[in-house]
């Protein structure tokens, strides 16, 4: 039913308590619809509407970068390092970080991974999360790099940014090689030995 909203049972055992919880949930939904803060969501960290508007594209790009890095990296990963440069370092990047972690884990753990449990799911796999906000010049107004580092310190990475007046999401680096690829659809990544006679 499209008009039904369900919430988890919160332990309100009396009629009055259940009514109060119902009113509180309705007020929270009204707040979100009027541009307020997302509070007490079941599968999303709390964010105000302005943060959702500003970070929404980065959340989407981050998820795609996480998925890409997981697919180009081997199964044994010791550290997942996420580095931010540019304007984004001034913001709370928690939702972007969780989107990257969720994207990285999606093909491993399936749909059971969400924005709330992604950090814990990563930890359970023995992967250390490392978040860096860099003030160094990246050459872009905003850049996100995701690195999967193996136990022997081999790094597999992808970086993304937004290009042009319309802020089109682009993958600009894969494993340290500069590229410019739209961050959408399917992407075939091949690596071969760079030697004469090899195509």
Residue ranges and their predicted role:
Residues 1-2, 10-199:
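NAD(P)-dependent dehydrogenase/reductase Rossmann-like domain
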């Amino acid at each position: 039913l499209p008009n039904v909203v369900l919430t988890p049972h919160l332990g309100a055992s009396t009629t009055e308590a259940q009514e109060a919880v119902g009113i509180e949930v309705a007020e929270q939904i009204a707040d979100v619809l009027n541009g307020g803060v997302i509070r007490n969501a079941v599968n999303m960290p709390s964010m105000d509407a302005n943060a959702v508007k500003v970070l929404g594209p980065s959340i989407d790009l981050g998820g795609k970068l996480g998925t890409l890095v997981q697919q180009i990296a081997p199964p044994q990963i010791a550290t997942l390092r996420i580095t931010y440069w540019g304007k984004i370092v001034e913001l709370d990047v928690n939702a972007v970080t969780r989107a990257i972690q969720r994207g990285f884990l999606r093909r491993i753990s399936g749909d059971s991974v969400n924005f709330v449990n992604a950090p814990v799911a990563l930890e359970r796999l023995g992967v250390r999360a490392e978040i860096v906000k860099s003030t160094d010049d990246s050459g872009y107004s905003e850049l996100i790099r995701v690195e999967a580092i193996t136990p022997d310190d081999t790094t597999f990475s992808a970086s993304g940014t937004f290009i042009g007046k319309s802020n089109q999401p682009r993958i600009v680096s894969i494993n340290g090689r500069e590229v410019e690829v739209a961050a959408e659809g399917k992407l075939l990544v091949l690596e071969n030995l760079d030697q004469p006679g090899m195509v």
